[in-house]
Amino acid sequence: MKKFNLFLIFFMTTSRLVLGQMDINAVNKPVELLNSANEDIENGNYTDAVQKLLAAIRLEPKIREMYLSLNTACSHTNQISILKQYLIKAKAIFEEDDEICYYLGNIYQNENNFQKAIAEYSLAIKYAQKNGEDFELVYAYYQNRASCYLKINECSKSIPDFTYALKLNPDNGAIYANRGIAYYKTGKKTEACKDWRKAQSLGNSECRNLRTPVLQISNIPRR
């Protein structure tokens, strides 16, 4: 009986060790795939990265960084339908995640689904106000929502967003250029020319083509 008890204890202990090892492997494998995928991204091997990230998410769907890396990889391989599917999944898992909503908004904007894009950017802005606006991409939440408003000719709505984006990123010539277009379309030609001049000073040479005819037609003094 003692020998049997010793054997049983040994068997149970060994089983626990094996199960413990299996548990560790189950935890480590998706992380290993993620790390390998990130190395692939750094080396420009985006197709391999996508496959590894999809495998990692299947094993463990609750690691946020996997979806962020997938956004980078799929954007380079143009696998947007896959990316969209997984970002929607991520949005359901990670509540009030402004960055994920922003990336989803970008997909809708590229699909010319501007109302859905505006909705996602609005969520991103709302969550960023809770999570903190020190994240480097927050200015783009406002910039991209403003761009959507501009594309659907709701120019008066775009101007406050462009203005706030400039508060967060004051040296962005593209924002000045687009706010200038919004000003022009709302009849504010002087403000438009000021923005285009500023954009030009920041390296956006195309603004000269916008600004010069307006100055000539409107008799606005050059500065």
Residue ranges and their predicted role:
Residues K29-P30, R64-E65, D98-E99, G132, ...:
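Helix-start (N-cap) detector for alpha-helical repeat units in TPR-like alpha-solenoids
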Residues M22-N28, T190-R223:
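Terminal, low-structured helical/coil segments at or just beyond the last alpha-helical repeat
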Residues S69-T72, Y103, L137, N144, ...:
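Canonical tetratricopeptide repeat
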